[in-house]
Amino acid sequence: MTSYSSATARAEMSELRRLKSLLPPELQSWVMVEGSTEVNPPLIRSEELGRDEIEIQVDLAKWENLAIDQRNLLFWHEVARIQSDTIPREGWEMAALAIGLGGAVGELWVQDGLLLLLALGLCGISGYRLWQKNNGEKRIKEAIEADEKAITLATRFGYTLPNAYKSLGSAFKTLIEQTPNRRQRKQYETRLQALRQSAAKMKAKTQKAKAL
């Protein structure tokens, strides 16, 4: 049992080192790659640790069910999100919303109209920012853009365009099969459809260039 645990730990550390080597040189000094320690975490996500440090967290138990090429493209998707500055951040919105609501209740008690308006205004601004951050259409658009950039990153590491598209597409197909959450599965399906359209455009563009 102990030897099995040791072998698993070594395999996980080896995979984390391998993923670290897939970071572009300009990111290697400030982007960390670690195994997730949460209960039922997402497959892969990024978290801002400080102003100049980001950690990519991987659920290694689920991760090992994917082929190497699938892992690579999903990892580069996350890298692309970091490069595009679209990873989720712990913002001021929730704190501002709590302060605004608390202030509104307090000003209702003391009946100060101006301060009540200010508190309600703070609630409105922070609530709108929270809505923007969690807007489904915006998030899927950012994900599709990151998929495109992941393809480009793959070519920097030796993939041909057809192989990069094929690897990411097969990753989506696997995730669609393995994801029980209907909403999450729908997002993967949408991204797969967008990827197919992009691949078709790229193929047509390549064939046109060859014909010239």
Curated annotation (Swiss-Prot):
Q: Which UniProt keywords apply?
A: Coiled coil, Membrane, Thylakoid, Transmembrane, Transmembrane helix
What InterPro entries has UniProt attached to this entry?
A: DUF3318
Q: Where in the cell is it found?
A: Cellular thylakoid membrane
- Coiled-coil spans in chain: 180-212
Task: List all membrane-crossing ranges.
Answer: 109-131
Topology class, membrane? Single-pass membrane protein
What does UniProt give as GO cellular component?
plasma membrane-derived thylakoid membrane
The signal peptide, as residue positions, is none
* Top-level taxonomic group: Bacteria
- Its name, as the record gives it, is Thylakoid membrane protein slr1949
This chain's source organism reads: Synechocystis sp. (strain ATCC 27184 / PCC 6803 / Kazusa)
